[in-house]
């Protein structure tokens, strides 16, 4: 399983067909996982997106150093991190998406104290809030871009410590596409849906 933007793609771990042999390296975003119905493991990365999987091995591409189209590509100093995580449950129940996000955007600690505050969160672990931004129309509205990350039809709620009362569904161009709902309303996303 390889993470892609707003979801994942499953690819075979064998090279028994001709086109599988040519696919010795594929891209991923923050993780690549090997798993079955009861357990699994994943390699997490923060900036290197080439990976090869064969049987039970994951190979990582650190540098390409191709001579074309740029003679000096990948030359110089590189900094990157890899992590490893494992779980003893199905992939659908595993926290790998959250672990990959935390690995890529670690928490920074500062001295002092603050009250607990969460601008936005969901009550479904597989529904990820990817973006919070001001609306392009300069109305002052906030846009939440979220997606379903585990290929599961999901009902969920959004929670906020901000004074938000109403949600208005919109498409990726920020055009309203549904009726306004109260913040406490139950919402729905289809598998891998971006909302």
For each of these PLM feature ranges, what is it?
Residues 1-195:
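C-terminal (or distal) subdomains of carbohydrate-active enzymes
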């Amino acid at each position: 399983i390889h993470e892609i933007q707003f979801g994942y793609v499953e690819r075979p771990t064998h090279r028994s067909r001709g086109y599988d042999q040519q696919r010795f390296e594929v891209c991923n975003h923050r993780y690549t996982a090997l798993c079955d119905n009861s357990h699994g493991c994943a390699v997490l990365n923060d900036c290197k997106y080439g990976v090869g999987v064969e049987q039970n091995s994951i190979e990582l591409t650190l540098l390409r150093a191709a001579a074309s189209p740029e003679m000096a590509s990948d030359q110089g100093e590189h900094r990157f991190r890899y992590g490893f995580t494992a779980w003893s449950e199905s992939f659908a129940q595993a926290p790998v998406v959250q672990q990959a996000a935390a690995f890529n955007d670690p928490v920074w600690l500062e001295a002092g104290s603050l009250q607990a505050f969460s601008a936005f969160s969901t009550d479904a672990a597989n529904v990820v809030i990817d973006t919070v931004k001001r609306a392009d129309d300069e109305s002052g509205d906030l846009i939440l871009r979220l997606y379903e990350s585990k290929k599961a039809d999901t009902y969920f709620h959004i929670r906020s410590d901000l004074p938000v009362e109403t949600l208005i569904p919109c498409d990726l161009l920020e055009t309203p596409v549904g009726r306004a709902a109260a913040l406490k309303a139950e919402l729905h996303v289809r598998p891998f849906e971006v909302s």
